[in-house]
Amino acid sequence: MKLTELKPDKNGKIKSLGEDELFLNRVTSIGLTEGTPFQVVRNDRKMPVLIYARETLLAINRSDCEKIEVEEA
């Protein structure tokens, strides 16, 4: 499932970040790697998705969230 599909207050784990090297560099620089656990804080349709991961609150734009495969934990 994509990150945009998880509801607020749900926990998940990053399953795959895709193969786009520019995208991989960007998301790994903010601490998101495969296997990273997180909690969805906010997921409104027109706003960035807010997640809490590695003791940090991150806002990820929706188009990037479509590239991130997750599994519910």
Role assignments for model-derived ranges:
Residues 10-23:
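Short, structured beta-strand/loop micro-motifs enriched in basic residues and often containing a Trp
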Residues 12, 43-73:
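C-terminal structural segments of small proteins and small subunits
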Residues 1, 20, 42-47:
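Short, charged beta-turn/beta-strand-edge "cap" motif at the junction between a beta-strand
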Residues 2, 26-28, 48:
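Short, conserved secondary-structure segments in the cores of folded domains
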Residues 22-26, 36:
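Short alpha-helix capping/helix-loop boundary micro-motifs
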Residues 5, 16, 40-42:
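A residue-level detector for short acidic-glycine micro-motifs
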